[in-house]
């Protein structure tokens, strides 16, 4: 840091798409004042491209991305996602999604996963069986959604695999979809830290929009609770893990 207060180091690479140049003292002050300064022991914090923690008042309609990109979060649909204090995995609230016509959307050039490695994860709470309900799709509208995670006939699905495992009911569960390469069986789904499916996924995901809580159509939304949705452009888990201690979410 220059003693005269001009610059603080070089700007982290994940913020390059937002602001060129170095960080000033005012940049740091404003982040701290807005509680946006990231203090984390997470070794992958600079690889995070989306981090929704769903904190807010009951029936709240404001959603904040806590990741380095500070993405604007949009509510899409006529029903609308809300924050609910009725149940939460961490802190005081979670996101409550309607069964239809209500999901969240974020967009940024850095959201494109390409053919690289990634970890998509979240905590979910489901009170009743899921029929055709979306967890994450890429794209901006019904006609171009690419479904990544969903629940169909109460079975979990990921891109390229179906009917993997039943959706747990009436308890929080952690779901992590990890692509550690594009070779055979390098795309893995973990339920509560235990590997339940592995397949091949060599898709090039160039979409810069995430539609969270929706299936192939806005008529099929998540319809349940979600907490701590996070996407990381890195492999967080190579083997079974403990989601209570190994995720850096709590």
Walk through the language-model features, giving the residues of each.
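Extended recognition patches within non-cytosolic domains
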Residues: 5, 11-50, 57-69, 184-188, ...
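A general structural signal for stabilizing positions within well-ordered secondary structure
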Residues: 42-43, 166, 220-223
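Extracellular glycan-recognition modules
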Residues: 46-49, 58-66, 100-155, 181-186, ...
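Bulky hydrophobic/aromatic "packing anchor" residues in well-ordered structure
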Residues: 65, 95, 136, 211-212
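Extracellular glycan-interaction surfaces
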Residues: 68-101, 120-130, 142-203
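Flexible glycan-contacting loops in extracellular carbohydrate-active proteins
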Residues: 196-225
């Amino acid at each position: 840091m220059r003693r005269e207060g001009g610059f603080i180091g070089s700007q982290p690479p994940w913020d390059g798409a937002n602001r060129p140049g170095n960080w000033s003292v005012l940049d740091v002050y404003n982040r701290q004042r807005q509680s946006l300064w990231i203090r984390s022991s997470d070794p992958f914090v600079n690889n995070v491209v989306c981090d929704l923690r769903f904190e807010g008042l009951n029936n709240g309609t404001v959603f904040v991305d806590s990741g380095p990109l500070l993405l604007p979060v949009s509510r899409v649909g006529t029903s609308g996602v809300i924050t609910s204090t009725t149940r939460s995995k961490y802190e005081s609230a979670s996101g409550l999604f309607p069964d239809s016509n209500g999901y969240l959307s974020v967009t940024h050039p850095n959201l494109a996963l390409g053919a690289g490695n990634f970890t998509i994860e979240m905590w979910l709470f489901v009170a009743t069986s899921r029929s055709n309900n979306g967890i994450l799709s890429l794209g901006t509208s019904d006609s171009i959604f690419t479904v990544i995670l969903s629940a169909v006939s109460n079975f979990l699905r990921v891109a390229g695999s179906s009917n993997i495992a039943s959706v747990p009911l009436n308890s929080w569960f952690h779901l992590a979809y990890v692509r550690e390469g594009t070779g055979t069986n390098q795309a893995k789904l973990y339920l509560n830290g235990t590997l339940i499916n592995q397949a091949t996924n060599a898709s090039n995901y160039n979409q810069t929009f995430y539609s969270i809580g929706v299936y192939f159509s806005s008529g099929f939304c998540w319809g349940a609770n979600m907490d701590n949705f996070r996407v990381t452009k890195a492999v967080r888990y190579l083997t079974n893990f403990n989601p209570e201690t190994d995720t850096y979410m709590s």
